[in-house]
Regions:
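Short amphipathic alpha-helices and their capping/turn segments at secondary-structure boundaries
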Residues: 1, 27-40, 147-157
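Residue-level signal for the start and early helices of compact helical domains
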Residues: 3, 74, 127, 150-153
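Hydrophobic residues within beta-strands of alpha/beta enzymes
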Residues: 3-5, 42-43, 162
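Membrane-targeting and insertion segments and their boundary/processing signals
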Residues: 4, 8, 94-97
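Active-site beta-loop-alpha junctions enriched in small/polar residues
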Residues: 5-10, 47-49, 107-111, 137-143, ...
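Active-site acidic/histidine proton-transfer and metal-coordination neighborhood
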Residues: 13-134
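Gly/Pro-rich active-site loop or hairpin
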Residues: 113, 117-121, 140-171
């Protein structure tokens, strides 16, 4: 069996509804595939901040600080509207995962809203889904200046999946 099935769908966090819906549809397919392969969960990067990326830029699993320095937020972005829509989409994603008996793991990475345990815990508190979990990626969290010991303590029962890596948080 596959321990975790990885989906990388930053469009779930898109402020553009049609992009987000397409990503949610793909996420549901990812849940179906994960369950088929016997995974205990699906993993995605945490919701990406709604930056405006160049249209011809490919999707990356990790965005470098150099890339993020050269993008900006949409001029007319309303944080409240964006946050409410994001919570609705994340709620749907958690439900899809639960429907397939899967945990939904948030992967911390530069540029996401869950790049630290605090970001994840805020999202978890807002959503309340028991199957929403955090991928404790030691390298990425170290890169984000997370106190690893404190992060482990804060996660408590949400500590379910640890990725021990040595990539300086950049791969």
């Amino acid at each position: 069996a596959l321990p975790v099935f990885c989906t990388v769908l930053p469009g779930i966090a898109s402020p553009q509804g049609e992009i987000a819906q397409k990503s949610l549809d793909l996420f549901k397919t990812g849940c179906e595939l994960g369950a088929y392969f016997g995974a205990r969960g699906v993993l995605d990067n945490g919701p990406l901040v709604p930056y405006e990326f160049p249209a011809d830029m490919p999707i990356h699993r990790h965005y470098s600080p150099d890339v993020l320095r050269n993008v900006r937020l949409p001029q007319r972005l309303s944080w409240k509207v964006y946050w409410d829509n994001l919570l609705s989409r994340m709620d749907t994603a958690c439900k899809f995962a639960a429907d397939y008996g899967l945990n939904y793991y948030m992967h911390p990475c530069v540029g996401s809203l869950t790049d630290t345990t605090n970001g994840y815990l805020l999202l978890k508190e807002e959503l309340g889904w028991e199957n929403l979990k955090f991928n404790f990626d030691t390298s990425n969290l170290y890169y984000m200046h997370e106190n690893l010991s404190l992060g482990l303590l804060k996660l408590g029962k949400d500590l379910d999946y640890i990725h021990i890596s040595d990539s300086y948080g950049q791969r």
